[in-house]
Amino acid sequence: MGHFRFIFEDFRPEIRQYFIEADQDALPFSRMQRSLVYQRAKNQNADKPFGSIIDVYADNYRFMTHSLSPCTPADPKTFRILVGNSQCSQPYSASIFNISAMSFGSLSANAIRALNKGAQMGSFYHDTGEGSLSPYHLEYGGDIVWELGSGYFGCRTLDGQFDPEKFAVQAKRPQVKMIEIKLSQGAKPGHGGILPKDKISEEIAEIRGVSRDHDCVSPSSHSAFKTPIQMMHFIQKLRELSEGKPVGFKLCIGQPWQFMSIVKAMLHTQIIPDFIVVDGSEGGT
């Protein structure tokens, strides 16, 4: 009978989700939130009549109050920010809401297609993640931000170094709007990413430029630069190779003095990144 414990452990997530979990238990998203996504994905009406199951009298419940003289709704076309300083010749008008980094390989081809189709429909950008730029990112024509991690997937030599010629070919694509250098990530403090070899298909190996014989590991730091000043020159190099597209970097701030050293390098070299992405320590960008 003791062996049934292992069966129950296997079924535990499903039992909890279908029989125990309340509609508003958010771990990380509640059933109510997930249902809203499902219905909108199917273009179905997500409104429910006869009140709400939410306790609107609970502490810290936030709501919008009515006005007898409401403002005219803003034009969605104004919800954009121009990214690109004077050192960039192809600035990009970015939406204030976008799709942050998720790699092909970790996500399926259909998931990448769906995300990029959404970006195309909503006129916002889709960050590739460090797993390279795949054909599925390009299929529907949504704007792309190409994330470049320490593994240089999609633009690397056989020994894992940065290959400027391969980078230029991809970066010059009209659909690629910006380049993002990943320095660090909240979900992976102190080390690079890993894709187990069992998940590396022939297609993934070809897209990333890696072998299928072992796990695909991103180094903990970049080989193309070692110091903040070298990083600024690398940013300028990527700008030139991409024909003037915006180049920025992503980091999860650990020690404030390390970030200040990057700021000092900007002042010293007068090379200014076009944007900075701050990654949350809980893993959220």
Protein language model annotation of sequence segments:
Residues 117, 133, 138-140, 159-285:
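Alpha/beta enzyme core
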